A protein has these predicted regions:
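Canonical Rossmann dinucleotide-binding motif of NAD(H)/NADP(H)-dependent dehydrogenases/reductases
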Residues: 1-20
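Rossmann-fold cofactor-recognition segment
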Residues: 37-56
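Residue(s) in the substrate-gating loop at a strand-loop-helix junction
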Residues: 130
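C-terminal helical subdomain
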Residues: 170-171, 185-222
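Conserved mid-core segment of classical short-chain dehydrogenase/reductases
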Residues: 80-96, 139
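Active-site helix of classical SDR
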Residues: 110, 146
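Active-site loop immediately N-terminal to the catalytic Tyr-X3-Lys motif
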Residues: 135-141
Length: 237
């Protein structure tokens, strides 16, 4: 929502967007989010019921939005679950649930979106990966492996979209202090949702391929990739 808020604020100055579609589960509960967007400058805000795990319905949801609102300019794909690593190590069903939401469902919606935006000849896609997928750690390897898959898929999709008029921005945040990580001790180089949103909007404006949040994580993980495996294995999250 922080990204949408900034895009709405830009729209109020004539430099952004006026119409926003919030696609989410329990979309009827998004009164506060809709009011926030309108206050920021959005002219039209619509809510659409969307269950990311219901991959069979992805195409229908997107077609309905496009048919009613016309070409899509910016699509921010922002859903996922952290899961419980300890449970996932014992419960294959839970592990598969994390993989399905964080990877499989993304492959589905991004494939449909890529085809839709290609047909338009323009548009921007925002995909949220994570540094957890840059090098997967013992502490959260189920979630990390899903993010690693998503990162690779999005990177390849961005290359496939080159020359089509469609731009894909891949965002790699570190630990984000927010609802998903509530109750957890922040990791080094943590960021807030506002900081992630600022970096994302700047990346869209500059048509960047990849944005690390915070930027220092890029050189940090360049080194992390080279650590010997026995050392890496002992690192905390």
């Amino acid at each position: 929502m922080a990204v949408a808020h900034r895009l709405a604020s830009q729209g109020a100055t004539g430099q952004g967007y006026d119409t926003f579609v919030l696609a989410a589960r329990r979309s009827r509960d998004l009164d506060a989010q809709e009011a926030d967007l309108r206050k920021a400058g959005a002219g039209t805000v619509e809510r659409v019921e969307f269950d990311a795990d219901d991959v069979d319905n992805h195409r229908a949801v997107l077609d309905d939005i496009a048919n009613r609102h016309g070409p899509l300019d910016v699509v921010v794909v922002a859903f996922g679950i952290l899961g419980d690593q300890q449970r996932a190590e014992q419960d294959a069903g839970h592990a598969l649930g994390v993989i399905h939401t964080d990877y499989v469902a993304h492959v589905s919606i991004l494939t449909h979106l890529a085809n839709l935006l290609r047909a338009q000849g323009h548009g921007q896609l925002v995909v949220f990966s994570s540094v957890a997928g840059v090098r997967v750690r013992r502490a959260n390897y189920v979630y990390g492996s899903a993010k690693a898959g998503l990162d690779g898929f999005a990177s390849g999709l961005a290359d496939a979209l080159a020359g089509s008029g469609v731009h894909l921005l891949l965002v790699r945040p570190g630990f984000v202090i927010g609802r998903m990580t509530e109750g957890m001790t922040p990791a080094p180089f943590s960021s807030t949702p506002d900081q992630v949103a600022d970096a994302t909007v700047a990346g869209l404006r500059r048509r960047r391929d990849v944005v690390w949040v915070p930027a220092i994580l890029r050189p940090v993980f360049a080194v992390m990739r080279l650590l010997p495996r026995p050392v890496w294995r002992r690192l905390p999250r």
